[in-house]
From Swiss-Prot:
Organism: Segestria florentina (Tube-web spider)
Family that this chain belongs to: Belongs to the neurotoxin 16 (SFI) family.
A Pfam entry, by short name: Toxin_28
GO molecular function: toxin activity
Protein name, entry field: U1-segestritoxin-Sf1a
Region (Keys region for toxin activity): 31-33
Described function: Insecticidal toxin.
């Protein structure tokens, strides 16, 4: 798990969750570090 990524709020910009538009979505959590 990446500590910079909050479970309830995800920042989606590209393949990573590094800032950008704040969306509550699981799209960000589908990344390898969440699995």
């Amino acid at each position: 798990r990446q500590d910079m990524v909050d479970e309830s709020v995800c920042y989606i910009t590209d393949n990573n969750c590094n800032g950008g538009k704040c969306l509550r979505s699981k799209a960000c959590h589908a990344d390898p570090w969440e699995l």
